[in-house]
């Protein structure tokens, strides 16, 4: 398998994707959340596993160090997955001077899932857990994991979803509660295969709301590798409203036509990039961050690497 993967990655290098930016120190990462602290610009990244693993550095390139867990011992949510939390998403509210972390509580292959929320004044370990914000049911059409907060048209919106009926949005009343009568609205879907689309992330730039998401299979690369090209890749769509009508660069709907323009896929020593987000760095501009597997290091989730690239822009579309 390793020889076949190496040949595939070599051929994929012709796609002209840039290699990840430099990373030193502890560069492990999985489904990273990311924030540059408001007070001093220090970088923090948060990863799937246990009570959410936290790494910190004064520089984006590192050296990165593990500093602890956001919720040691897990979440207060009553669920089988409460001690192995997934997919953290971080944002800051100036009105409360607090950082908010949305996290996922679930088990593989299940729609019995919960999005929880926790707060911190400084991004350091030992956050205050506020428990469940939203829950999906085992027989439902959507999966309450992979949450992302965004201000859309001045209102707080939670984007979430994985597989099944794809990516959805929910209006919030505030960072700790849903809006009255809130129901999920579907914004992106992949009708093919097992509907492998997840990790939606919305950001705003110059009149457009951009939706990035991960398409393809996320893991088991070491024990049950997917067919060539079916591993994770990062795609993008955009919308003027931010709450629907997302299309890709060719104009295909990302809800009804399986749209999505690939901005990063396997190449070189980068395999299965995904679990992504975007932030505006104080000096570099817009930066895409994600995890990936480096075959020279290993393909298991415990060997995933943190990756980042400065986004380039042409005609209102990002690339790396």
Swiss-Prot record:
GO MF entry, a single one: arabinan endo-1,5-alpha-L-arabinosidase activity
Keyword terms, alphabetized: Carbohydrate metabolism, Glycoprotein, Glycosidase, Hydrolase, Polysaccharide degradation, Secreted, Signal, Xylan degradation
Record pathway: Glycan metabolism; L-arabinan degradation
Glycosylation sites: 126, 190
Active site: 31, 198
Catalytic activity: Endohydrolysis of (1->5)-alpha-arabinofuranosidic linkages in (1->5)-arabinans
This protein's record includes keyword Signal: yes
Protein known as: Arabinan endo-1,5-alpha-L-arabinosidase C
Origin species: Emericella nidulans (strain FGSC A4 / ATCC 38163 / CBS 112.46 / NRRL 194 / M139) (Aspergillus nidulans)
Gene symbol of the encoding locus: abnC
